[in-house]
């Protein structure tokens, strides 16, 4: 029997399990279901997966496509927020774009500082 969801087409029971597993992994990778990883016991993880499978196997396209859309929007929003924070940090930390332009070599590095110290010590000895 062919069960079709909006984003995927699923052929049989194994396909449904694969689809549900994809949804679980999507959720799991964004850290939403904390209860899913509470126990390290393999059986309890399988049981919770089984429970989640029955929860998610609602025979309506709207619920699944809505769920996947929510996950994708959540991912896009968090990604854009983190990118914005990173770019703001770069502007405030490095206002002249020294790191961006590759002019970092103008700053004294550890090697140069050691070299200067050695020169200073030789001057003192002489």
From Swiss-Prot:
State if Transmembrane is listed as a keyword. yes
Segments spanning the bilayer are 55-77
Where is this gene product found?
Membrane
Give the way it sits in the membrane.
Answer: Single-pass membrane protein
Assigned GO CC terms? membrane
Alphabetically sorted, this entry's keywords are: Membrane, Transmembrane, Transmembrane helix
Q: What is this protein called?
A: Putative uncharacterized protein DDB_G0284397
Q: Which organism is it from?
A: Dictyostelium discoideum
């Amino acid at each position: 029997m062919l069960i079709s969801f909006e984003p995927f087409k699923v052929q049989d029971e194994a396909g449904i399990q694969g689809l549900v597993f994809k949804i679980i992994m999507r959720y799991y990778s964004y850290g939403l279901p904390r209860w899913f990883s509470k126990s390290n016991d393999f059986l309890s993880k399988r049981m919770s997966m089984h429970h989640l499978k029955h929860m998610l196997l609602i025979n309506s396209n709207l619920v699944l496509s809505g769920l996947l859309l929510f996950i994708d929007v959540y991912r896009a929003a968090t990604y854009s927020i983190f990118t914005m924070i990173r770019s703001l940090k770069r502007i405030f930390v490095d206002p002249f774009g020294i790191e961006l332009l590759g002019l970092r070599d103008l700053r004294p590095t550890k090697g140069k500082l050691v070299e200067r110290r050695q020169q200073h010590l030789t001057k003192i000895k002489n």
